[in-house]
């Protein structure tokens, strides 16, 4: 297996313009495909997940052109639900941001489409979404294991009264929200359980509004959506920088700044993961906000005990930042980590122990006490981009760290290690 050893880093300084947000990129692509008119998307993320969405749209007859660097996409909308000419199988890798929204959108009208992906995708639950779509009339079959992909979709979704479990993934609700306006009937969506990663629902609602559709949101417990609507292209749309990707650089600034400035997100960002900067501030770093930037300056870091339900992806970065904080850090209400690219709670606990931390892994929490000195270790990444990027921070000590399968960052940030090196002064 390929590996990358990062030597100790004495200081991190400078600015980075972030690649486009994965969450925003894939939502914007799907809405542009469903909309009337042509949309020009700029600062689109070039990553595995986005390529899977683009390949699927192409197979469904959507025409688009990409710039040479794949960050600008001119896409001609279908002016309504996507149609397959004949039976079709779409391979979506391990892209949850493609699988969940497409599973819903392709239940409109009469299609026969199979959605499948990598082995890990077949372990990521989708049963709550399928249950909700069936309540709205959709015909869906599980082809292997009950409640998991691959799925066969045969249309039939018309809307109506629907319940969705919000406790596992907000992507299920996102998928229903984006699909419901195109259903023939009005839809009332009721959320059961505590809604995880609520800020991601705000991204969805924001983007739908940009494409001309507004829905009634009753305290995130009930959403009322008029049927028979159309999305309309906004013309041009700039994809915000990825706030989850910003977390690694901001944390590096907190641990070994200098000052690190990330551009492409700021106080006006719609992504909940910008709140990661507030957590660093609580830990002792100095944060400066602009409309389209966030800067972080080193501080003496101390442990925190916090509910991280609102920023589950960026919270992973706090787990490795905790190695540099005084005291024991506890991250709570993060069960959602278990159903991501890998079981992130298990993976994080396992790899933190390798570098010497004392770790308690609970059902939905993790407690981390740093060692007096970090140990060199070979870090397993579990084909999870965030594991690779989180553990790069170990090099901000006086100990090297070896990252196994470093290219797994291609899911959201193909040149992450080059960018980190550019801003780093070796010890």
Swiss-Prot record:
UniProt GO MF annotations: 3-phosphoshikimate 1-carboxyvinyltransferase activity
Alphabetized UniProt keyword annotations: Amino-acid biosynthesis, Aromatic amino acid biosynthesis, Cytoplasm, Transferase
Pfam family, one: EPSP_synthase
Signal peptide extent: none
Domain of life: Bacteria
Family, similarity comment: Belongs to the EPSP synthase family.
Function: Catalyzes the transfer of the enolpyruvyl moiety of phosphoenolpyruvate (PEP) to the 5-hydroxyl of shikimate-3-phosphate (S3P) to produce enolpyruvyl shikimate-3-phosphate and inorganic phosphate.
Official protein name in the record: 3-phosphoshikimate 1-carboxyvinyltransferase
Species this protein is from: Salmonella paratyphi A (strain AKU_12601)
């Amino acid at each position: 297996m390929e590996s990358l050893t990062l030597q100790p880093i004495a200081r991190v300084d400078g600015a980075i313009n972030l690649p486009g947000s994965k969450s925003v990129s894939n939502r914007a692509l799907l809405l542009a495909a469903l909309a009337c008119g042509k949309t020009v998307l700029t600062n689109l993320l070039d990553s595995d997940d986005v390529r899977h969405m683009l390949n699927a749209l192409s197979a469904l007859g959507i025409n688009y052109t990409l710039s040479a660097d794949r960050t600008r996409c001119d896409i001609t909308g279908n002016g309504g639900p996507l149609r397959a000419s004949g039976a079709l199988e779409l391979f979506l890798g391990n892209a949850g941001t493609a699988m969940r929204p497409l599973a819903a959108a392709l239940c409109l009208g009469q299609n026969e489409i199979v959605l499948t992906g990598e082995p890990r995708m077949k372990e990521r639950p989708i049963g709550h979404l399928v249950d909700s779509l069936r309540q709205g009339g959709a015909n869906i079959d599980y082809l292997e294991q009950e409640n998991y992909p691959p799925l066969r979709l045969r249309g039939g979704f018309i809307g109506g009264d629907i319940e969705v479990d919000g406790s596992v993934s907000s992507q299920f609700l996102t998928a229903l929200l984006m699909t419901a306006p195109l259903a023939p009937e009005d839809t009332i969506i009721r959320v059961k359980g505590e809604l995880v990663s609520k800020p991601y629902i705000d991204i969805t609602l924001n983007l739908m509004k940009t494409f001309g559709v507004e829905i009634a949101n009753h305290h995130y417990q009930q959403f009322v959506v008029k049927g028979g609507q159309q999305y309309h292209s906004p013309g041009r749309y700039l994809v915000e920088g990825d706030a989850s990707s910003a977390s690694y650089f901001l944390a590096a600034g907190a641990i070994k700044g200098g000052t690190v400035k990330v551009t492409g997100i700021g106080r006006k960002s719609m992504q909940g993961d910008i709140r990661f900067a507030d957590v660093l501030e609580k830990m002792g770093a100095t944060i400066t906000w602009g409309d389209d930037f966030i800067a972080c300056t080193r501080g003496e870091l101390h442990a925190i005990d916090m509910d991280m339900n609102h920023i589950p992806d960026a919270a992973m970065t706090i787990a490795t930042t905790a190695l540099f904080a005084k005291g024991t850090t506890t991250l709570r209400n993060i069960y959602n980590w278990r159903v991501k690219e890998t079981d992130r709670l298990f993976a994080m606990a396992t790899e933190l122990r390798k570098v010497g931390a004392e770790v308690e892994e609970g059902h939905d929490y993790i407690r981390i006490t740093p060692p007096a000195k970090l140990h060199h270790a070979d870090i397993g990444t579990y084909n999870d981009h965030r594991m690779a990027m989180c553990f790069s921070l170990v090099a901000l000590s006086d100990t090297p760290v070896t990252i196994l399968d470093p290219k797994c960052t291609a899911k959201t940030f193909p040149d992450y290690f080059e960018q980190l090196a550019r801003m780093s002064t070796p010890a």
